[in-house]
């Protein structure tokens, strides 16, 4: 009998591969060299062969999904299981892959797109997904997920996990709001969020010793 997790896993692979039909249908209309990377002014600064993008990218993301899910499952088997984390991992890669693939194909078909706004929205999505998950991790699960299994005082971790969670969710919301401004506002905001996360993580690490 297929478990709910296995069903979600198979669906995630379908979600990764399904957008490839968009690229295959429009293959003849796509340029031989496709733009795959862009600067803050929405100008392409990285190119790749058409076949590599249309067919290679989904296959690469499938392999990446297999690695992410495999490592997560291995970690759960040998350390502490984290069902919500596994579920989040299962769907982050397919969502990112689908949006990135569709955006890349659309841009190379000369559709007008704001690449940086799409990129910032994806980052905001990741921040909020992780931030929503973090407060569910117990101190023991956190310790087991790190090499050596060092203990962390429950009170310290309870405080830190909410700080991290609120920062990620709040930061994600602010990033979404920043797309109505300029690219540099979004970049600056990301820098502040990352710096805050590093400081909080250091506090949690030092406070446990």
Predicted feature residues:
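Select subsegments of transmembrane alpha-helices in polytopic membrane proteins
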Residues: 8-12, 53-60, 68, 86-95, ...
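Alpha-helical transmembrane segments
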Residues: 12-15, 46-61, 112-131
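Active-site and channel-lining beta-strand-loop segments
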Residues: 23-54, 141-153
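Membrane-water interface of transmembrane alpha-helices
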Residues: 25-30, 62-74, 128-146, 207-208
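Ordered, amphipathic secondary-structure segments that act as subunit-interaction surfaces
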Residues: 69-117
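Alpha-helical transmembrane segments and their membrane-interface junctions
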Residues: 99-115, 169-190
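Membrane-helix boundary/juxtamembrane motif in polytopic membrane proteins
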Residues: 119, 142-167
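Small-residue-rich transmembrane alpha-helices that serve as helix-helix interface/gating elements
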Residues: 122, 186-200
